From Swiss-Prot:
Protein topology in the membrane: Multi-pass membrane protein
UniProt-recorded name of the protein: Disulfide bond formation protein B
TM ranges: 17-33, 52-67, 75-92, 148-166
Gene: dsbB
Stretches assigned to the Cytoplasmic side: 1-16, 68-74, 167-173
Stored Pfam families: DsbB
Compartments, record wording: Cell inner membrane
InterPro entries: DiS_bond_form_DsbB/BdbC, Disulphide_bond_form_DsbB, DsbB, DsbB-like_sf
Example GO molecular function: protein-disulfide reductase activity
Membrane side Periplasmic: residue ranges: 34-51, 93-147
Family: Belongs to the DsbB family.
């Protein structure tokens, strides 16, 4: 229980939320390196996964606003969970495009954003897709990029679950 109490206290610090934000910044910079230095063309699914990652960053910013306020902290947890779950579902779908190809299951040709937020027009260097979802263009330790994203988003959900359990556990005084 001491570990859960420590995790609850840590989640009430701004440092914990800024650390989550730092991970998002790191992974986004990795994506930019892959795209602009290694010249790996991002596909539609890559862009959607990138947005899910940025959603985790927004969750971190929400939590960092007032981490000692339970309402703000739980809003941060909810946004973290929603973005991580959506990212995991997108990454799993992307892995299926790569390793279980089907003429009936293909990704879109173009990213689609709401008319009120055409991100690919506002920031094309970050949100424009021109790659093929089914191609494996990069691997590290035998895993493709979407497979790594499955690991990353699943790890986020696991970390979130641990922090939620810590919030609900009774703390000894």
């Amino acid at each position: 229980m001491r570990i859960l109490s420590s995790l609850k206290t840590f989640s009430q610090s701004r440092l914990s939320w800024l650390l989550l934000l730092a991970f998002v910044v790191f992974f986004t910079l990795c994506a930019m390196y892959f795209q602009h230095v290694m010249l790996l063309a991002p596909c539609v699914m890559c862009i959607y996964e990138r947005i899910a990652m940025l959603g985790i960053g927004v969750a971190a910013l929400i939590g960092a606003i007032a981490p000692q306020n339970p309402v703000v902290r739980w809003l941060g947890f909810a946004a973290w969970g929603a973005s991580s779950y959506k990212g995991l579902m997108l990454a799993i779908e992307h892995v299926n495009y790569q390793f279980n190809p089907s003429p009936f299951a293909t990704c879109d040709l173009f990213v689609t954003f709401p008319a009120w937020a055409p991100l690919n027009q506002w920031a094309p260097n970050l949100f424009e897709a021109y790659g093929d979802c089914s191609k494996v263009v990069w691997q590290f330790l035998t895993l493709s990029m979407p497979q790594w994203l499955v690991v990353i988003f699943a790890a986020n959900l696991l970390a979130l679950a641990i922090f939620v359990v810590a919030q609900l556990a009774k703390t000894s005084r």
